[in-house]
Structure formats: C-alpha cells, structure tokens
Amino acid sequence: SHSDIGTEIADNPRLQKTDRAQFIAMMEHLDLAAPTHLTEALRTNLSGAKTVAGLLADAAARVPFVAMDDLAAALAAGNAGYVLLDVREKDAFDAGHIAGALHLPRGQLELRVNDMLPDPTARILTICEFGRISTLAAATLRDLGFTRAAALDGGVKAWREAGLPLADG
C-alpha cells in the first residue's frame, strides 16, 4: 500500500501525539522490534558515512572487470595476462582456488601487498567468492598505486558453477 504525508498526519494514531514525552511513552509501550539494519542506518545517518552498498557502487564504478569466460580461455591458452590474487580467507582458498592464484586475504591486503607484489605496473586480477570483496580489493589496490588492478566478475562461486577447474590447497 502507499500513502502521502498529509494522509499519514491526519490518520496515523502514532502521529497524533504532539508532545514528545507522550510520543516516546506510546512507542515504548508498543514494544516493537528494532528494524533490520537499524544500526547501519543510524551510523550512516549520524555520520554521513557511506553504506556498504555505496562503497561497492563507488568501487565498481572505477574498477574494470574481467569476464569469467575470458579468464578461463586465457588460462587454457597458458597465459592469464594477470597476476591472480585470491583475497578470500585461507580456508576458502584451500578448499578450492583458480590454479596459479596467489593468496592474500583482504584483511591483510594493505599491509602485505607491497612485499608480495612489488611491481605497481603489474596487471592484477582480484578474486573472491562472489565478486564483491574482490571489487573493493581492486579499488584499494588502485588507491595504493596498482593502477592496472581489476576484479573477476562473479567470483569463485560462478567459476565453480560453470564447471571450471579449481585447485586444492
């Protein structure tokens, strides 16, 4: 259903209270459950910060994506053209990763990337489970001067579902 502000003010009993204390007492008496994502919404509204969806959208707007089929074809031809960087946690990486991928968890990226990948001109392809964390990782790499970083579209989940090979351990 839908409504407009005028109708709500006229008809909604919760909006009939003009005294702040009465309104608070009435709302507390209803004992309503807190809305989902209330903490994030409050933090965002109070600080002016971005939401997770906003961070992902900003990152996706400035990161190129590599299609799963393009990477699979390049790997089959023996030349990925990228340094593959799997940013998932160790247990996920060990359970199955794209052959040849280096492992650097997203939580350690900023601290360890320069030691692991000293060439800022390298073409780096970040990989995660669903394609979201790898997007953030690629954006971070670009912020750190790795200007050719990209993200695998769809992640390992899509790779697995397509029946493409994964290496263990």
Indicate where each model-derived feature is located:
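Short glycine-rich anion-binding loops that position phosphate/pyrophosphate groups of nucleotides
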Residues: 89-91, 130
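A short, well-structured juxtamembrane/interface segment
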Residues: 60-77
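Catalytic cysteine-centered active loop of the rhodanese-like fold, especially the PTP/DSP P-loop
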Residues: 104-161
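Short loop/helix-cap segments at secondary-structure boundaries that form the rim of catalytic
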Residues: 93-99, 159
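Short hydrophobic beta-strand that contains or immediately precedes a catalytic carboxylate
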Residues: 71, 83-88, 104
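Conserved beta-strand scaffold positions in the cores of enzyme catalytic domains, especially
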Residues: 65, 84, 101-103, 149-151
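Accessory terminal helices/loops
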Residues: 1-65
